[in-house]
């Protein structure tokens, strides 16, 4: 599918209330990690009326906001200039990733922008920080992730409600700022958010309704179906950067879409094959445990020697079945296919990948 086909027919301006609603529905229906909710009806495969759905997300029990106690400081959480943990989930995450996380890309793609148009340079980087980090804030809530970059996740420090609301607030402010000062960039931002949330919503539906929903998807082989979702959810983030730099121009769409696909593949593989990544996230095979589709899972579903283990794990979510599925994912056949796909996806992107980093070692893939 071409990039132009993806974006065809997308409105340049989306009502802000609709955007906020989409953001909320796409993420926060995952309301608890322990209780279940019962739908009244459904037209989705694999979720018959009256059945219960296990929702991953908000942790049970009390959470405390960060303080300046000795215990908090010993945890190594990001501090401000006075040695205090930031009293804001977004600033806390900025402390983990660094301010203007995409600056290296901007300097490589438009090296003169900072001097020629410093206002645009700052706005572009602020937009990219807001989209990237706010999506991470809410994604960690959905996955009930205990760690991010080997630090306690924001929602476990500040609470899920405050963390999610702060993400909406930061995004709303940057949308209004862009629409007011650079309307073309504002329109690109809104369009990108719609596409990203469309991809994330599809991923969450698959997680909610299980493999029956994924199997029911049309559009060719299952790798292609998964890739389409990943290009919406992750590829659009990188495409947005090119659109912002080129005032809506599509000159960089193809290469940045490829970079986004590589990033998704790399993240999926690290989730299964990197002990370092598991330590930084505080969980092994988090995607598999959450019943979430990933590239290794899709590959294993298409292999007769591993399909049954994956399907059993997605059906039961039991620890024993999950460990059996993890063994299947780490078999040489599946590892080799994932390694080959990762190498092919990265061809010609070496310079951009060097800027992106993400160098956690993957023992099982020999990288």
From Swiss-Prot:
Which residue intervals are annotated with compositional bias (Basic and acidic residues) in the record?
70-82
Listed GO biological process terms: alcohol biosynthetic process; isoprenoid biosynthetic process; mycotoxin biosynthetic process
User: What's the EC number here?
Assistant: 2.5.1.-
Which biological pathway? Secondary metabolite biosynthesis
Binding sites annotated in the UniProt record for Mg(2+) 2? 139, 143
Its needed co-factors are: Mg(2+)
Question: What does the UniProt cofactor note say?
Answer: Binds 3 Mg(2+) ions per subunit.
Q: Which Pfam families match?
A: polyprenyl_synt
Xref: InterPro entries: Isoprenoid_synthase_dom_sf, Polyprenyl_synt
UniProt keyword list: Glycoprotein, Magnesium, Metal-binding, Signal, Transferase
Locate the residues binding Mg(2+) 1. Answer: 139, 143
Q: Signal peptide location in the record? A: 1-22
Identify the domain of life: Eukaryota
Binding residue positions for substrate:
132, 148, 233-234, 264, 271, 281
- What is seen without this gene? Simultaneous disruption of idtB, idtC, idtF and idtG eliminates the biosynthesis of the whole spectrum of indole-diterpenes reported to be produced by C.paspali, including paspaline, paxilline, paspalinine, paspalitrem A and paspalitrem B.
Compositional bias (Low complexity) at which positions?
Answer: 32-42
Segments carrying the region annotation (Disordered) are 32-84
Described by its record, this protein's role is as follows: Prenyltransferase; part of the gene cluster that mediates the biosynthesis of paspalitrems, indole-diterpene (IDT) mycotoxins that are potent tremorgens in mammals. The geranylgeranyl diphosphate (GGPP) synthase idtG is proposed to catalyze the first step in IDT biosynthesis via catalysis of a series of iterative condensations of isopentenyl diphosphate (IPP) with dimethylallyl diphosphate (DMAPP), geranyl diphosphate (GPP), and farnesyl diphosphate (FPP), to form GGPP.
**Which family, according to the similarity comment?**
Belongs to the FPP/GGPP synthase family.
Q: What is this protein called?
A: Prenyltransferase idtC
Please tell me the species this chain comes from: Claviceps paspali (Rye ergot fungus)
Could you tell me the gene encoding this protein? Answer: idtC
């Amino acid at each position: 599918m071409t990039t132009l086909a993806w974006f065809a027919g997308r409105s340049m301006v989306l009502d802000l209330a609709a955007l906020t609603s989409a953001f909320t529905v796409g993420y926060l229906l995952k309301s608890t990690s322990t209780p279940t909710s019962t739908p009244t009806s459904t037209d989705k495969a694999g979720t018959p009326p009256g059945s219960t759905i296990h929702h991953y997300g908000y942790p049970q029990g009390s959470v405390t906001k960060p303080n300046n106690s000795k215990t908090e400081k010993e945890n190594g959480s990001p501090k401000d200039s006075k040695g205090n943990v930031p009293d804001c989930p977004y600033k806390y995450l900025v402390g983990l990733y660094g301010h203007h996380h995409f600056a290296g890309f901007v300097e490589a793609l438009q090296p003169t922008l900072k001097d020629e148009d410093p206002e645009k340079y700052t706005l572009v980087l602020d937009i990219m920080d807001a989209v990237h980090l706010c999506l991470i804030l809410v994604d960690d809530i959905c996955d009930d992730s205990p760690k991010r970059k080997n630090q306690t996740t924001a929602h476990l420090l500040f609470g899920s409600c405050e963390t999610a609301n702060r993400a909406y607030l930061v995004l709303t402010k940057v949308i209004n700022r862009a629409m007011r000062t650079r309307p073309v960039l504002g329109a690109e931002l809104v369009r990108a958010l719609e596409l990203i949330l469309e991809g994330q919503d599809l991923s969450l539906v698959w997680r909610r309704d299980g493999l029956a929903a994924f199997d029911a998807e049309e559009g060719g082989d299952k790798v292609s179906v998964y890739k389409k979702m990943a290009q919406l959810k992750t590829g659009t983030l990188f495409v947005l950067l090119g659109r912002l730099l080129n005032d809506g121009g599509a000159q960089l769409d193809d290469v940045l879409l490829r970079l986004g696909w590589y990033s998704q593949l790399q993240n999926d593989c690290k989730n299964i094959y990197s002990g370092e990544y598991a330590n930084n996230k505080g969980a092994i095979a988090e995607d598999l445990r959450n019943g979430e589709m990933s590239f290794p899972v899709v590959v294993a579903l298409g292999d007769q020697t591993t399909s049954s283990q994956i399907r059993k794990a997605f059906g039961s979510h039991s620890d024993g079945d999950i460990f059996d599925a993890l063994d299947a994912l780490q078999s040489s056949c599946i590892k080799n296919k994932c390694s080959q796909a990762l190498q092919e996806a990265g061809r010609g992107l070496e310079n951009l990948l060097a800027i992106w980093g993400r160098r956690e070692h993957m023992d099982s893939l020999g990288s």
